[in-house]
A protein has these predicted regions:
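Sequence/structural signature of beta-propeller domains
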Residues: 288-305
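C-terminal substrate/ligand-recognition segments
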Residues: 359-417
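Ordered core of a single globular domain
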Residues: 272, 277, 285-287, 400
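Histidine-centered copper-binding motifs that mark active-site loops
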Residues: 26-277, 297-299, 309-367
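Active/binding-pocket-proximal capping segment
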Residues: 243-255, 401-422
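Short glycine/proline/serine/threonine-rich loop/turn segments at secondary-structure transition edges
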Residues: 131-135, 283-290
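Bacterial Sec-dependent N-terminal signal peptides
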Residues: 1-28
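Long, structured stretches of catalytic cores involved in phosphate-ester chemistry, encompassing
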Residues: 270-274, 283, 296, 391-394, ...
């Protein structure tokens, strides 16, 4: 079997010093930047240092994929073989992890697949995932926080025949909008403040949506689809609209739900994705509303719910409600989606009774090198902590014994959460 390849790159020095064009006007709002798309079966991705005008004054040092912050949205089709050419022009080693994708471990892009400076990594795999919103991001051990803070990452949208058969909004950038939610803090020179001490929070003081501060977008007077990703280091979001309108969850990390779920609030934790439909058909052209984080008054342990604004675990966004996107209503498109399907998919879910193996995993304090560990065991790159047999169904009980809330994600596979107790 041919494995992913790494080759040295020719000596090229490129310095990007570009203003982040959507944010050059410092009014109340700035136009939401929507990433370009790449489609096909071969994708060329270059990771470089750059700089962007995120605040008045000095440029902020950033890093991005094929640009100055974040990266292009990759459009993949279920059943295709896809080939990635990942060029690392950074001065540091990095990785690129395909978050949520089912693929061979050697193609995963986790800490065990480093890409040294000046080299090319060429993973490939057959797309077997259902249509959904996924993403890619760096995952180098002890460098993930810094490289994600600088802006490396991007969306992946998988399409399939089931999703294509439904009358859903899918005109990218018009009625189908990707939203990466992050926050950042800055020092006096406008550099990103990155805290490498794992026992200090990574909560940012200022909201960035797709890298845009004070983001606003124009959306048509019809059903609109928002693909929302929590791309934070730590913060959670309790999302809803400023008029408390009902919206509908149609998909999550694993793909389409069986039917839309009506809500007025939804919590989104780090790395998690949802797709929602919101009906703007009854809104007047020229009116506006906000997608907001209703993060005030959250229970103890909610990431970003701490009632402190500075110091350890402090942030100006902690324990308050704030806008993540200002929405202006414009005229309908020429072919609007005006109704919502009652049925989306026919998923069959396992139950706890289907499991033949049960495990209990405790989330515990990690000591000086990490705020978290599993079962009091420090992480080791050379250690296999759990061995799972292929084609078995397991029930895992995750018990968080830590004082902080934390998300849980397994590379390569999806899992069904059937109970959650606090």
């Amino acid at each position: 079997m041919n494995h992913s390849k790494r080759t040295n790159l020719p000596g090229i020095l490129l310095l990007y010093t570009l203003a982040f064009s959507p944010n050059n006007a410092w009014g109340q709002y700035d136009r939401l930047w929507i990433p370009d798309t790449l489609s096909g079966t071969t994708f060329n991705l270059s990771i470089r240092d750059s700089s962007a005008q995120l605040r008045p004054g000095n440029l902020t040092k950033t890093a991005g994929v094929n640009g100055k912050f974040w990266g292009p949205t990759l459009i993949l089709n279920k059943g295709d073989m896809v080939y990635m050419n990942v060029y690392n022009y950074l001065p540091d080693t990095t990785t690129l992890h395909w978050h949520g994708m089912h693929l061979p471990a050697i193609m995963d892009g986790g800490p065990h697949q480093p890409i040294p400076p000046g080299t090319l990594w060429q993973p490939y795999w057959k797309v077997t995932n259902n249509a959904a919103t996924y993403w890619y991001h760096p995952h180098l051990h002890m460098m993930t926080v810094q490289q994600m803070t600088e802006g490396i990452g991007g969306f992946i949208i998988v399409r399939d025949s089931q999703e294509a058969s439904l009358a859903l909004p899918r005109t990218y950038g018009v009625d189908d909008i990707p939203l990466a939610l992050t926050s950042r803090s800055y020092d006096a020179s406008n550099a990103f403040a990155v805290y490498n001490n794992v026992n200090i929070s990574q909560y940012g003081d200022y909201m960035l949506t797709n890298g845009t501060p004070n983001a606003q977008v124009s959306l048509p007077k019809q059903y609109v689809r928002l693909r929302i990703l929590n791309a934070e280091i730590e913060r959670g979001y309790n999302l809803g609209f400023s008029d408390n309108r009902t919206f509908y969850i149609i998909a999550n990390d694993g793909g389409l739900l069986n039917s839309p779920v009506a809500v007025t609030r939804v919590k989104l934790m780090v790395g998690e994705r949802i797709e929602i439909l919101v009906n703007l058909g009854g809104d007047a052209v020229g009116s506006s509303l906000d997608l907001k984080a209703y993060n005030s008054g959250q229970p103890y342990g909610f990431p970003g719910g701490e009632p402190i604004t500075s110091g350890l675990n402090g942030s100006l966004l902690n324990n308050i409600d704030f806008s993540v996107l200002h929405i202006n209503i414009v005229a309908t498109t020429s072919n609007p989606v005006t109704t919502m399907p009652a049925t989306l998919a026919n998923n069959t879910y396992w139950t706890a009774g289907d499991a033949t193996v049960s495990r209990t995993v405790h989330v515990t304090g990690g000591g000086t090198d990490s705020a978290f560990s599993f079962d009091y065991t420090p992480f080791s790159m050379g250690t296999i902590n759990k061995t799972v047999n292929l084609n078995t169904i397991e029930k895992w009980t995750i018990v968080n014994n830590n004082v902080f809330g934390h998300t849980f994600h397994i590379h390569d596979v999806q899992f069904m959460q059937f109970e959650h107790r606090i």
